[in-house]
């Protein structure tokens, strides 16, 4: 605990209902008497305190304290639900925590309210892929300076890089951690053209509820007492592979045959989103085995938001026998299945027959969705994009085993049949038939948008902190050129058949001076705002290479009624 005791974060808002909202904050001490003080009469509500179970640091952490190995970092979460609130009425609040010193610590004062009533005009930030990237603090600062206090934040995944590394959420010394940037307490310095500019992010979520979706960077891989956090993050395997190993050595791993031991072992030896689940309080979706917040739906004013868990591990696109990638295993690992990566494995199914698909089908048919003025579906993986992460198809990897003439295994390759793409073949028809107006996503670190024949809008507004480029004719994606691969992997354009829409207000140009229908820049950062009063989605950019320049609104489109 630092010598100057303080709250680890400002409070932020979660899971509003028609008469309540949850207030959450974090400390590095367990403390006592954690409470929310709210309203003109300064009513108080005591908070429930729990310790995060998996937050750690390691030698790669950017912290004031150095770590030689993976080390557990104690973080406490405090949550209080404020009830009896009136629709449309906001009240002031602050939080108080008492550390072991006995001297209470209070936050600044902010405002809270329940979910807005239908008809109330709202401005909602659409953002994704923060990941402590260089321009994120600048982006969020410009959101606050341009829009003012937003009413909510919809965040389409990839909040941090390594979800179990505590400092990435709270206090990375580079100044771009997740909560500081969304609370106006960041301190990230960009150097552009010889000019250094420090950005603090925007004071946004203290007074506006945050609704995230799970991206691939919210998922930790196999747990280890010795491997670094980066290596653990990059090492998920399917539950089926973990179960096979468990069954082979069940008497060793679980000699008493306890069900909780089995489930814990399988989670630790496959993948998990425990830290994400422990940090956030989100609406719950019913399942046969209980409830989940991995995916959910909620009504916020005139918006029905559906947040899906549609993502997969990101593996290297390099095609060679020395890389455990999306297209093959390392030759050196062929005799050791425990080291196999299993290609671009999908973390949660959206196929027909899966729990998520069944829940979504019911949700899309519900009165809450069908009667909503604006129907918005948020997920991490892109259905349509010029970015790199849309190839190969979003489907279960099909292993191909190569043998020599003597029958020896000499290679494992993975194919991804395009006709089995789960998003395009199963999810998109479901959304289209239900009258969805906006599909919002991220993952490729690019701004571009598309429109289907029926008028469903697709927006990827993920050129927030950085970009990895748009794959046009002069910048093709790395895809397999080996003739052994039978599938076709598109190197340019949107592989799923839509043409990107040129921005309606102002376009950027390529090096030849031609207008381009995207932003893929490490100097220009973009954000989008859903204005429910106008029925409009507007997108803005800011050139960090010209820190004195103005924010530019460059695109807008309306959300038509289906």
Regions found by a protein language model. Name each.
Residues 4-8, 15-22, 28-31, 42-44, ...:
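N-terminal active-site segment of His-dependent metallophosphoesterases
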Residues 129, 157-158, 215-216, 380, ...:
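Active-site glycine-centered loops adjacent to acidic/histidine catalytic or metal-binding residues
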Residues 82-83:
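Hydrophobic core positions of the immunoglobulin-like beta-sandwich fold
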Residues 137-140, 161-180, 219-232, 388-391, ...:
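Metal-dependent catalytic neighborhoods of phosphoester/phosphodiester hydrolases
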Residues 120, 135-140, 156, 174-181, ...:
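Stable alpha-helical elements in mature extracytoplasmic
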């Amino acid at each position: 605990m630092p010598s100057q005791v303080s709250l680890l974060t400002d409070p932020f808002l979660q899971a509003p209902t028609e008469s309540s909202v949850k207030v959450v904050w974090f400390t590095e001490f367990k403390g006592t008497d954690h409470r929310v003080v709210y309203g003109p009469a300064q009513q108080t509500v005591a908070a429930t305190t729990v310790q995060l179970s998996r937050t750690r640091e390691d030698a790669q952490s950017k912290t004031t304290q150095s770590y030689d190995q993976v080390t557990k970092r104690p973080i406490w979460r405090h949550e209080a639900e404020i009830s009896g609130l009136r629709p449309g009425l906001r009240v002031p609040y602050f939080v108080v925590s008492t550390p072991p010193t006995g001297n209470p610590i209070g936050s600044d004062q902010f405002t809270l309210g329940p979910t807005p009533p239908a008809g109330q005009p709202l401005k909602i930030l659409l953002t994704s892929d923060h990941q402590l990237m260089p321009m994120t603090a600048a982006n969020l600062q410009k959101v606050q300076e341009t829009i003012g206090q937003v009413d909510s934040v919809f965040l389409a995944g990839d909040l941090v890089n390594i979800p179990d590394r505590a400092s990435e959420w709270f206090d990375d010394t580079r100044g771009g951690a997740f909560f500081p940037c969304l609370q106006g307490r960041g301190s990230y310095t960009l150097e552009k053209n010889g000019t250094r500019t420090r950005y603090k992010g925007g004071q946004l979520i203290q007074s506006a509820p945050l609704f995230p979706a799970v991206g691939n960077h919210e998922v930790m891989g196999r747990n280890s007492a010795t491997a670094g956090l980066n290596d653990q993050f990059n090492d998920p395997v399917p539950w089926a592979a973990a179960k096979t190993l468990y069954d082979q050595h069940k008497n060793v791993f679980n000699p008493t045959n306890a069900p909780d031991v089995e489930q814990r072992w399988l989670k630790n030896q496959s993948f998990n989103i425990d830290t994400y689940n422990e940090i956030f309080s989100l609406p719950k979706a019913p399942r046969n085995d209980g409830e989940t917040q991995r995916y959910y739906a909620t009504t916020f004013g005139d918006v029905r938001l559906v947040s899906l868990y549609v993502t997969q591990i990101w593996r290297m696109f390099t095609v060679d026998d020395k890389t455990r990638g999306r297209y093959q295993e390392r030759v050196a690992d062929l005799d050791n299945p425990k080291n196999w990566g299993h290609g671009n494995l999908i973390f949660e199914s959206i196929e027909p027959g899966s729990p998520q698909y069944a829940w979504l089908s019911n949700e899309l048919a519900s009165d809450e969705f069908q009667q909503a003025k604006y129907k918005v579906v948020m997920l991490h993986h892109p259905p349509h994009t010029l970015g790199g992460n849309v190839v190969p198809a979003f489907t279960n990897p099909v292993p191909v085993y190569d043998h020599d003439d003597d029958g020896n295994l000499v290679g494992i390759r993975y194919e991804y049949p395009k006709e089995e793409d789960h998003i395009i073949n199963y999810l998109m028809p479901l959304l289209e038939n239900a009258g969805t107006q906006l599909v919002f996503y991220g993952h490729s670190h690019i701004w571009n948008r598309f429109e289907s024949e029926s008028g469903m809008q697709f927006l990827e507004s993920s050129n927030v902190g950085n970009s990895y480029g748009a794959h046009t004719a002069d910048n093709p994606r790395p895809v397999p050129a080996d003739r052994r691969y039978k599938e076709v992997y598109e190197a340019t354009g949107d592989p799923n058949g839509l043409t990107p829409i040129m921005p309606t207000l102002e376009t950027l140009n390529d090096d030849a001076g031609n207008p381009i229908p995207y932003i893929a820049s490490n100097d220009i950062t973009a954000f989008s705002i859903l204005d429910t009063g106008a029925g409009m989605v507007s997108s803005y950019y800011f050139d960090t290479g010209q820190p004195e320049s103005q924010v530019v609104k460059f695109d807008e489109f309306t959300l038509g009624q289906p």
